[in-house]
Amino acid sequence: MASVFGKPRAGGGQQSAPLEVNLAILGRRGAGKSALTVKFLTRRFISEYDPNLEDTYSSEETVDHQPVHLRVMDTADLDTPRNCERYLNWAHAFLVVYSVDSRQSFEGSSSYLELLALHAKETQRSFPALLLGNKLDMAQYRQVTQAEGAALAGRFGCLFFEVSACLDFEHVQHVFHEAVREARRELEKNSLARPLFISEERAVHHQAPLTARHGLASCTFNTLSTTSLKEMPAVAQAKLVTVKSSRAQSKRKAPTLTLLKGFKIF
């Protein structure tokens, strides 16, 4: 049976239940978050979209021969992280996006990684994050070098990629599937660590919202010092993937888009 998005599932035999993964796309306005999301879901590149539109999309994917029900939240923060509990408490993994031709968007991505590090420290949990330099097709106007991107990713212990949403679908798909793999590893680790029995009832302590505990207004991190944060432990060296221009088209039939309201698709 064919899926709405992603690869159709093979027929015959008993299918295992799909893994459910929630992925939040973070970054400053103009970094290309919506373009990446639409490219992944439809193989198409959009030239116009509403920067204030935030929505969540679903895609049936197959990653490493395992069915995955992937939900992608295309967030609509403007210039700084705001009302961040909506995705911090929802996502299993995060894709932090900046544009290689914008120093401001790169600095904004650092704020998002700091936010995730603080959230991990407060919750005593690990949240996989991938740093993505977008608009590689604009490399002649670079303001952020590959080395700077790799250094920032290494500082927070996350994977690093550079892609272009308008050029190559396969590499964009690879990044999203890597996010699924990172989330799956973390989910499996948490599942193994979960106790099998609860011997006694324990009082549940409700923590105050992230902003209230740290005196932060709407999760804005403009004045947050990086030295006050305990960075996420580096589980692996930052990996750099540089995507070159490619016009090769995949043979997979382009899926039908049903949820992308407010986009002008070409």
Curated annotation (Swiss-Prot):
Q: Which GO terms describe its cellular component?
A: plasma membrane
Domain of life per record: Eukaryota
Spell out the reaction equation it catalyses. Answer: GTP + H2O = GDP + phosphate + H(+)
Entry keyword Hydrolase: yes
What InterPro entries does this protein map onto?
P-loop_NTPase (IPR027417), Ras-related_GTPase (IPR051065), Small_GTP-bd (IPR005225), Small_GTPase (IPR001806)
Cite the entry's keywords alphabetically: GTP-binding, Hydrolase, Nucleotide-binding
- Record's keyword annotation contains Membrane: no
Enzyme Commission no: 3.6.5.2
GO function term, MF aspect, one:
GDP binding
Q: Where does GTP bind?
A: 27-34, 74-78, 134-137
NCBIfam families from the UniProt entry? small_GTP
Q: Which family does it belong to?
A: Belongs to the small GTPase superfamily. Ras family.
- Protein name (database record): Ras-like protein family member 12
